[in-house]
Amino acid sequence: MVPSLALVPGEPAGIGPELCIRLAQQPRSDAHLIAYADPDTLHSAAKALCLSVRLLDPDQHARLPGDLPLHPVRQAAPTRFGTPDPANAAAVIAGLLGAAGDCLSGKLQGIVTGPVHKAVINAGGIAYTGTTELLAAQAGCPVVMMLANSIVRVALVTTHLPLRAVPEAITAEALARCLRITATAMQRDFGLEHPRIAVLGLNPHAGEDGLLGREELDVIIPVLDQLRSEGMQLIGPLPADTAFLPQKLTDFDAVVAMYHDQGLPVLKYSGFEQAVNITLGLPYPRVAVDHGTALELAGRGVADPSSLLAATALCARLAARS
């Protein structure tokens, strides 16, 4: 069965809408896409790109270039590309939660999301730290943020936290939960029966036997030992500065980093254009672009759709497996 996927552009004033229009120019055989967006915004994006778009009823299938089934999500204010309006924050969140709700009900089999501007959502009066956290709260389940490209997959124990808050957040419970969710996803979603997972230390040189910090000795190593006794293939804790050497990456199926900026700079340097953001642990596949709203590019027709193309292709594969 060909899966039906929600396509949510994110911040309407950013590049998300025009990327969706570009995606609609290439009819797919691997998925049926349904946009959850404001129709006027999509028409404006198509006009800015000098491309055609034909918005269909959500139960219709795209057959021609420019066809895009639409579940309309009306905005409170018109879109001005490059100038976000907090009045539209509720529509952005409604699009995300509506699409995810249809996945939870079984109506859809996955969701592809564009970039969201956190500050604009909060300025609109909605407490929001990220789409990963939003969808986890809706589904009522723990999740893990993983970013991936063709070279490496990186899962995060902590996500959007100030650096000073990270050590306290690295608990045995949090680390074990992240590793279990990551291992299960590698098996279920990526078909790896015995995934090999590298685990980074928190401190420089992975703590150097306690000289540079005790988190490795007190938290990380005991958790790894316990999970190894249960059969998980875990390597580490490894010093982060050498874990990503090309000759080492072939030994791992995924890397678990302790915090956001520990693991993601290397991934983005190695292939930012093709990188995607995967939410592990949800009852449906969710894959997002790995870039921001790029307000300075919006409406100019120069935004690179590579990440959205990669996210859609991966979401279709994951949905077909589930």
From Swiss-Prot:
<feature type="binding site">
    <location>
        <position position="286"/>
    </location>
    <ligand>
        <name>substrate</name>
    </ligand>
</feature>
<feature type="binding site">
    <location>
        <position position="260"/>
    </location>
    <ligand>
        <name>a divalent metal cation</name>
    </ligand>
</feature>
<dbReference type="GO" id="GO:0008270">
    <property type="term" value="F:zinc ion binding"/>
</dbReference>
<dbReference type="GO" id="GO:0000287">
    <property type="term" value="F:magnesium ion binding"/>
</dbReference>
<feature type="binding site">
    <location>
        <position position="160"/>
    </location>
    <ligand>
        <name>a divalent metal cation</name>
    </ligand>
</feature>
<comment type="similarity">
    <text>Belongs to the PdxA family.</text>
</comment>
<feature type="binding site">
    <location>
        <position position="268"/>
    </location>
    <ligand>
        <name>substrate</name>
    </ligand>
</feature>
<comment type="pathway">
    <text>Cofactor biosynthesis; pyridoxine 5'-phosphate biosynthesis; pyridoxine 5'-phosphate from D-erythrose 4-phosphate: step 4/5.</text>
</comment>
<feature type="binding site">
    <location>
        <position position="132"/>
    </location>
    <ligand>
        <name>substrate</name>
    </ligand>
</feature>
<comment type="subunit">
    <text>Homodimer.</text>
</comment>
<keyword id="KW-0560">Oxidoreductase</keyword>
<keyword id="KW-0664">Pyridoxine biosynthesis</keyword>
<keyword id="KW-0170">Cobalt</keyword>
<dbReference type="GO" id="GO:0008615">
    <property type="term" value="P:pyridoxine biosynthetic process"/>
</dbReference>
<keyword id="KW-0521">NADP</keyword>
<feature type="binding site">
    <location>
        <position position="277"/>
    </location>
    <ligand>
        <name>substrate</name>
    </ligand>
</feature>
<dbReference type="InterPro" id="IPR005255">
    <property type="entry name" value="PdxA_fam"/>
</dbReference>
<dbReference type="GO" id="GO:0050897">
    <property type="term" value="F:cobalt ion binding"/>
</dbReference>
<protein>
    <recommendedName>
        <fullName>4-hydroxythreonine-4-phosphate dehydrogenase</fullName>
        <ecNumber>1.1.1.262</ecNumber>
    </recommendedName>
</protein>
<comment type="function">
    <text>Catalyzes the NAD(P)-dependent oxidation of 4-(phosphooxy)-L-threonine (HTP) into 2-amino-3-oxo-4-(phosphooxy)butyric acid which spontaneously decarboxylates to form 3-amino-2-oxopropyl phosphate (AHAP).</text>
</comment>
<feature type="binding site">
    <location>
        <position position="205"/>
    </location>
    <ligand>
        <name>a divalent metal cation</name>
    </ligand>
</feature>
<dbReference type="InterPro" id="IPR037510">
    <property type="entry name" value="PdxA"/>
</dbReference>
<keyword id="KW-0862">Zinc</keyword>
<keyword id="KW-0520">NAD</keyword>
<dbReference type="GO" id="GO:0050570">
    <property type="term" value="F:4-hydroxythreonine-4-phosphate dehydrogenase activity"/>
</dbReference>
<keyword id="KW-0479">Metal-binding</keyword>
<keyword id="KW-0460">Magnesium</keyword>
<dbReference type="GO" id="GO:0005737">
    <property type="term" value="C:cytoplasm"/>
</dbReference>
<keyword id="KW-0963">Cytoplasm</keyword>
<dbReference type="Pfam" id="PF04166">
    <property type="entry name" value="PdxA"/>
</dbReference>
<dbReference type="GO" id="GO:0042823">
    <property type="term" value="P:pyridoxal phosphate biosynthetic process"/>
</dbReference>
<dbReference type="GO" id="GO:0051287">
    <property type="term" value="F:NAD binding"/>
</dbReference>
